[in-house]
Amino acid sequence: SNGTISTASAKLERKNMIIQVYQSYLTDWTTDMITYLDANDSDKITSDAESAYPLALVNGKQYIIDQNGLTAKTIGFYNSWNSTRGELGALESIGNINIAVNKDTGKLCTITVDAAYEKNSKVSFEFVINDDFTLENGAINPTYTTGQKMTKAVMNTIIGMGTVFIVLIF
């Protein structure tokens, strides 16, 4: 027969094979990245980033991610961490690490990690890794309790009302 071979399925299967081969390396980098962020204060992380130190140079270990050095995307992730860390407190545990093939062109996989922190027991990290093993995107997604959401809402209301009164007075 004159069948057409699907390049899309071949590409996905190739990504699956790559992930199977490098799964332990991806998991190791993910665990060490979260541990590094927790163990260091904002000044140290900022200093490392501004000196272009990748995680490998900081930890003295070899990683498959960001082998050619720190990227702007990793620095963006560090900035997100620095702005979120105060809401989380200290790291208590790292739970499930799930590595899934990313179907987007140029993206190898998406790594999701469940972590528990002192002030927030449900935090999800998401890392999108490119085909060349560079970090494309890193996100920190805390799940807030109803009480935490209400506290933020009250603070926003107070700030909003205060701003209106100040504008009206002057």
Q: Which stretches of residues belong to each language-model region?
A:
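Hydrophobic secretory-pathway targeting helix
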Residues: 1-9
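Membrane-proximal low-complexity regions enriched in glycine and acidic/polar residues
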Residues: 12-99
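Hydrophobic alpha-helical transmembrane segments
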Residues: 97-121
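Extended, hydrophilic extramembrane loops/domains of integral membrane proteins
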Residues: 116-145
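Hydrophobic alpha-helical transmembrane segments of small proteolipidic membrane proteins, enriched
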Residues: 149-170
